[in-house]
Amino acid sequence: MTLETSDLTGDVQGVKPSLNVTVFGISAVVILAVSLASIFAPNTVQSLFDATVTWTSKWFGWFYILLITAAIVFVIVLALTRFGNIKLGPNNSTPDFSTFSWAAMLFAAGIGTSIMFYAIAEPVGQYIAPPTGEGETIEAARQAVTWTLFHYGISGWALYGLVGIALGYFAYRKHDRLTVRSTLRPLLGDKIDGIFGDIIDMFALVGGVFGIAASLGIGVVQLNVGLTIIFGIPQGLVAQIGLVSLSVIMATVSAVSGVDKGVRMLSSINVFLAMFLALWVLITGNTTFLLDALVANVGDFVTQFPVLTLETFPYQRPDEWMNAWTLFFWAWWITWAAFVGMFLARISRGRTIRQFVIGTLTLPFTYVLVWVSIFGNSAIDLIRSGNVEFTKIAYATPEGGLYALLDALPLGKILIAIALFVGVLFYVTSSDSGALVMANLSMRNLPDRQDGVAWLRVFWATLTGALTITMLLAGGISILQQATIVMALPFSFVLILIAAALWKALRSEASKATARTRAITSGLISMSGTAAGRVRLSWQDRLSRTFDAVSPTRAKRALDNRVVPALEAVGTRLQEEGLVSEILIEGSEAHDPDDDRRFLGRASLVVSATPEVMEQLIARLLDVPISGATIDAESFRYVVRMIVMPVPTFGATLSDEDDTTVRLEVRPHGGGQGYDIMNWTADQVAHDVLDHFERWVEYLGATSTVE
């Protein structure tokens, strides 16, 4: 056995979720103000963002690039070290989704309207106007796709992974709320439940709205071109407002009528349609060239990635190029980090950090690699073959590049119709998913498996749509890109704090694991009766104890007559030393949701103390002077659970469902293998409690001196 520690998680059980007026109100006012300014003073808004982006690029361009690089290194280090074995959930938890389903969801997460746009727009742009060197050369062609893979590749997913790990770790392993603020508890403590936490969530919310608006703006412009080609609907404000209205309607229907499952099913179909488009382009296009280029792109990306990820162009800085590409993409990833990170955390509960990192860095990028290589190289091949009309469309009006490429292939009009359908569905599902996360960030005390109220989802979908339209009016896609670069800056500092808090929590858990190992060793000795105060059982008695069934009545009697008195005796003695102790007797309603075994109840000893008392206790027991040190004084818990188990059988005999026994099991708080104290005396239980209490004190002493 080992100790249990409360993680100061701010348990919200029994507390009704409510609107966070501060986060909701201030965020809504900021976004509404920008929207109104874009309508009534578009030139002023354009000039303001021009100046702000120039300043941000000059003074913080290096910071964005270094931040993304640091995120990549950070998550890889987590995966390769002992931290990689830690689960996003208790040690005994299992993944909510099968490996195949989880991989499929990660794969699909790399798909969206924006990649349909940039898979052609960026390679064409980089080929004709590269950041350095001459355009429309063989070298420019190779670099064009490499730059696109770099901007759309593992860099951003490392950022998503960082936030996803932190959210999953604190929500599912530390039992905190699934919010951005909860990831900073190791640094800010209970301050995150006040104004500091509100500020953090506001940064995430406002930045996310602008990131989503940029995605929706790109989608609106591209889909408008598709509607013109298929249905003859003119490009302009009316069609764009119609598309935005469609996203709001879909979000409303999804929130009010509960058709989320239907939308998700269509999204799954959409993934296969997108893959069909890529396969069709590969087969009906210049197949051998595309396959050769795919292999070459992989090699170029792998060899050049270390250089590209730290490239700031200090000696010949292409400011306009940096703002339009690298800085925009890095800011875009940052604004989306909280939203995608929350999705990744939700689907990865029960996975280890190592599995999570490997999955998020490889599976979405696999799709990006294939899609960008096929479509990007196809576009470059058309340009190099002398297709002047395609070149003009793809470079001058990049939103029409995808349709122009498909139109050059067999069954072009049918392919365009499929691409339009795929784009529309990706567009509305992105809006709906974004509104859902915005609603969650606007709530207080929201359980991790519950979503925000319907009207909030509709509100945020509407406001985001309004922001998208007004900013398109003020300056088109370019102003949305500029706004993203600016709005990402506040949340970028939050990301640094998230990484620091996660690292601190993981190091603390590692120290705790060392103490736990000693405690388990002591517990195993106790089971054989060799520890102080215990009588060694004969091997015959120990074997009989293993196979004899224990009824619930007998187990309850042992709990009441031996375990609880032992806990009370130890608690009383600790109170005499100035500590606060409490005995909790709970029934089956206290069942651990992460344990699928039948649970009958539990008895717990909870011990806490002021930092001053703990300082004196550590100094006395460990002979370690720690005056003035910071003590991570979590509550000590010794919990005995009544668990129903099948009676062990061997050979050809199988147990019937009624062949069960009850264990009085002491199990670590983080999960793992517990042990049975059914036949222990009260004295043995008391000694076991003290064994782990001493380990707990040792752990506090170690962490207080290390910090």
Task: For the regions a language model picked out, list residue spans one by one.
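Loop-to-transmembrane helix boundary motifs in multi-pass membrane proteins
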Residues: 16-31, 189-198, 233-252, 256, ...
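Transmembrane-helix boundary/entry motifs in multi-pass membrane transporters
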Residues: 13-22, 57-61, 91-109, 145-154, ...
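Helix-loop-helix connectors at the membrane interface of multi-pass transporters/channels
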Residues: 4-18, 177-195, 219-242, 272-277, ...
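Helix-loop-helix module between adjacent transmembrane segments
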Residues: 14-25, 29-39, 72-77, 111-116, ...
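Membrane-water interface regions at transmembrane-helix termini and the short interhelical loops
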Residues: 10-16, 41-56, 75-96, 144-151, ...
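N-terminal alpha-helical transmembrane segments of multi-pass membrane transport
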Residues: 2-140, 256, 506, 593
